Amino acid sequence: MMLERARFLDAADPLREFRERFMLPDGVIYLDGNSLGCLPKATPARLEKVVREEWGRDLIRSWNTAGWIDLPARVGAKIAPLIGARPHEVIACDSTSVNLFKLISAALAMQPGRKVVLSEPGNFPTDLYMIDGLERQGLAERRLTERGRLIEALDDSVALLMLTHTHYKTGETFDMAELTRAAHDAGALVLWDLSHSGGALPVDLDGCAADFAVGCGYKYFNGGPGAPAYAFVAEKHLEAARQPLTGWMGHAAPFAFSDDYEAAPGIEKLLCGTPPILGLAALEVGVDLIAEIGIDRLYAKSQALSEFFRQCLSERNVAIDLVSPTDPARRGSQLSFRHQDAYAICQALIARGVIGDFRAPNVMCFGMAPLYLRYADIVWVAKVLAEVLDSEEWRDPCFQTPAEVT
C-alpha cells in the first residue's frame, strides 16, 4: 500500500528531475544530507575548468580574467536571497567556526558595558567553544539557559544572543522573529547559526531584523566536504561592525600593500586570507541548484518526505522514540530518533545501503534532502529500519566499535 502511494507521489513530484543532476552511488539511499550533501554532476566539470583552464592555462591572470577575486562576494550574493538577506549583506568565506569568532567578537565590541553571550546547553559545540575562547581572553562571559527560558534570561548584561536556528540533533527550529525581537527589546544583539537551515527551509533574516548570521556550505548547499561557509551582517551594522581577524583580503585596498590596516567599507571586511577558489567554485554550483528550484518548493517536499516517513514507520509498527517535534512547522529537514544503541543501528543500516547520521550519545538523524530523495526510497528505509530493529542484527560486534568519525 505504501509503495503504491510512493510511486504515485514520485510520479507527481515536481522536483523529480533534479535527482538526475546528482552523482548517486548504486545500492545506496542517502539520508545524511544534513551532514554532507551529495555531489552535483556539474561540480566535477566546473572544478576541471577551474583547474585546467583558469589555473593551468591562465595562471595568476585568472584573479582578474576569471573573476576569482569576486568569488566570495558573488557566491555570498547568491546565498543572500535564500536566507532572506540582501546581496551586499552576505559573503562566502572561511569556516563556520571562524566566522562565529569574527561575528561574536564584532558584536561584543559594539556593546560596551555588556559581556554576556547567551546561548543554550546542547547548542552545536563549535558555537559554545567560540564563546569559551573569547571568555578565556576576558572578552566574553558565557551563559547557558534552557531554550524555554531564554527570553526571561535576557537582562541588561547580555550583549549577544547566539543560537542555532535548527538544532543539529533534534531538528527543532527556533522562532527567529520572536527571539530576535525579545533580544532587541533587552538591548542585545542576535547571531543566528543557519548551518542546518540554510538551503533547507525558509529563513528571513532581514524580515526578522537579525543582526548577524553564519552558515555552512557543505550540508544542504552541496558544496562538498569542507566547503566555505558564509556570514551575514545586517546593513545597519556594516559600518560599525569590526572583526578581529584583520587579514589582508579584508583591507579596503589589499593591493596597495599598506603597513596599516583599514577595513573594507562593506561586507568584504569579513574576509581574512586569500579565498579558497576551488571550494568557492564547487559551492557556487550547489547554490545555483538551490536557487533554481527555490527554498519554498524544497521545504515543502522535505516536510512531505518527513511525514511520509513517519507514516511508513507507523504502518510497520516501528516503536522508536522520535525526538524531533511532531509539528512540521517546528522542525527543519530531518527526523531524529533516540535509541540507546543508535550508533550500532546506524552501522547496521549502512551495511544494508541506508546511510543516516549518528549524533552522540544516542540519536539517529535522517536528513530529508528533497533534491535527490524519492518517496520510494523512504518506503525502503522504513522496511530496512524495521528489519534491523526486529532482528537485532545491530548487536553484531562488527557494528559496536565507533569509528574516528561517527
Regions found by a protein language model. Name each.
Residues M1-T406:
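Pyridoxal 5′-phosphate
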